[in-house]
C-alpha cells in the first residue's frame, strides 16, 4: 500500500524541471516488483499521460487566443503611428515658418543696431577730427610764438588723436591730414632740439651759469621732447654726454702724459666734478626717468674702457702700476656703486647681471691682464720655497708636530687671498686658485715626499701630520674661495685634484713608515735566521736575541707613534706592523730550517714575547688605547705563525701523523705549501715523494680543504722548492693509487707519452 502511494508521488514529479530520469525509473521499477504492481503502475502512468495531454491542449488554445488578440492590437498600433507622424510633419512645417519670421525680424533689428553704431562712430570721428584740426592750427601758432611749455599738453593730445585715426588712413583726407601733422611734428621736434642745444651752450658759456628761468625753459624743451618717445630720447642724452665729455676727451686723449695709467686718478676726479656740476646745475633740466647722470657714466665708462684696454697691453707695464690703477678703479666703482645702487658692499650679489656689468665695467678690463699679478706671485712663492730648503738644513725645532714650512705656506696664501679679494671676486679668482693648487702640488712633492732612507721615524710622522694639516686646511681654503667668489664662479672653486694628491701622499708616507719598520724587524730577526734549530736539545728561557729585538722594535715604533697626531694613522701603522712582523718572522724561520720539535717549541716561547710587545704598540701613542679590532687583527697574524710552529711540533714519523696535523691545522690542499713545511721540518728530498703521495690520498678524502692557506702569502718561498713541488704534483696526478717509486712513475709517464 505504501508502495502505491510512493509511486503516485513519483509520477506527479515527472513534469518538474529538476526531474531525474534514471533515478525515477529505478524507483518505479525496483528489483522486487510483482506483476500486479506493473499493472497498477501502467494504469497510473496512463492517467498521468492523459492529464498531460489535456494540459497541453489547454495551453495551445490559450496561445492561439493570445496570438489573435496580439494581431488586432498591432493593427491599432500601426494606425496610431501613422497618425502621429502626420502630426509631427505638420508641426515641423509650422516651426520652419516661425523660424523664418524670427530670422527676418532679427536681421532688421541688427541692421538698426549697425546703423546706430555707425552713426555714433561717425559723430565721434567727426568730433575728434575737428579736435585734431583745431589742435594742429593752435600748435602752429604756438610754434611761431615759441611757447613750447603751452604746446606740451596740446602735442600729447595731438599724438593720441593721430593714433586714433591710424585705422582710417584709407580715407584720403584723413591720410593727407595725418601726413601734414606728422611732418609738422618732425620739424617741430627738430626745432625744439636745435633750440635746446643752442640755449644749453649759451647758458653754459655764461659766467653766472644757468638762471632759474633758463632752467625752467630748458626743462620745458626736455618735457616736449619726451612726448615723442616712451623711452628717454637717445639723441638728446647722447648729445649732452658728448658735450660734457668734450673737454675731457681732449685732455686725456691728446696728451699722452695725462692719459697714462699713472694719471688715472685724474680721470676719475674729473668725472666726479662733472657729476657734481650735473647735481648742482643740470639735474632740474632733465626728467628724472631719463637718468642722465647714469647715462653720462656709461659714456665715460665706454671711452675709458677703450683707453685702458690699450694702456694695459703695454709690455712695460709694472705690477705696481697695475695694482695701483686697479685699486683706484675699484675705489671709483665703489663711489659709483654708492651713488647709483646705494649699497654698502661693492660685491652685493643681488644685483641684476646688467647692473653688475654697468658698475663693474671698468675693473673688468683688468681681468685679462692678471697674468702679470700671477707671475709676480709665483716668483714670491718660488723664493718662499727656497727659504724652506734653507730652513730644512738649519732647523732645530724638536717640539713641532708639523713642518713649519706648511704653516708659512698657508699664511702666505691667506695674505695673498686677503689682498686679492679686495681687487676682484670674479674670473681672476679661478686663476689664483689654480696658482695655489700648483704650489700645493709642488709642496707635496718637495717637502712631503722628498724623503731619504736615512729619514727617522719622527721625520716621517711629522710629514704625515703635515700632510693631514695640509689636507684639512686646503678643504677650508676651498670653502673660503667658494664663499668669496661671485655665484657664477662658485662651481669652479674646486681643489679636488690637489686634495687627491695630498690624500695619496698620506698613504705613501704610511707605506714608507711601515716599510722602514719592516726593515728594522728584518735586522732584529737576523739572529733568528742563523740559529741552529735542528740540534737544540731543551727549551729554556726566551732566546738571547729576543730582548734586544723587542726593545729596538718598541723604540722605533714609539718614535713614530708618539709624534703622529691622528689615531687613524696610529691604528694603520700598528695593523701593518703586525703583518710586517708575520712576514719577517716566517721568512727568518724559513732561513733557519730545518727545525726540530724542540726548536719549534722554543720559537713558540720567543713568539710570545714578540706578541706581548706588539699588543702594547697602541699604548705608545698618548690618548690612544688598544681596541678589540686591533686585538683580533693581531690574533689572526700571530695565529699564522703559531699554526706553522704547531705543525712543526708534530714528529715527521709516522708520516700519516704529520700529514694529519698539517691538514687539521693549516687546512689547505696545496702541494707547494705542504712541501714548504716538509722543508722546514728537514725532511730529506728522497722522502718527500712518499710524503706527497700520502698527502694526496688524505686530501682526496677531505674535500672541504682550501686551495691555499693565507699563511703562505707572508712566506717567501724558494723558487727551487716551488719547482720541486710542481714536479711532485705532476707525478702524483699521473700515478696509480698503489705505492710506486719515482722511477716507476717516470717510466710510466714516458711510456704513456710514447703511446700517445
Swiss-Prot record:
Membrane topology (UniProt): Peripheral membrane protein
Disulfide bonds: none
Location relative to the cell: Cytoplasm; Golgi apparatus, trans-Golgi network membrane; Endosome membrane
Keywords: Coiled coil, Cytoplasm, Endosome, Golgi apparatus, Membrane, Phosphoprotein, Protein transport, Transport
Source taxon at top rank: Eukaryota
UniProt keyword Glycosyltransferase, yes or no: no
PANTHER family: VACUOLAR PROTEIN SORTING-ASSOCIATED PROTEIN 53 HOMOLOG (PTHR12820:SF0), VACUOLAR SORTING PROTEIN 53 (PTHR12820)
Membership in a protein family: Belongs to the VPS53 family.
Subunit (UniProt): Component of the Golgi-associated retrograde protein (GARP) complex.
Name of the protein in question: Vacuolar protein sorting-associated protein 53
Species of origin: Schizosaccharomyces pombe (strain 972 / ATCC 24843)
Gene transcribed to yield this protein: vps53
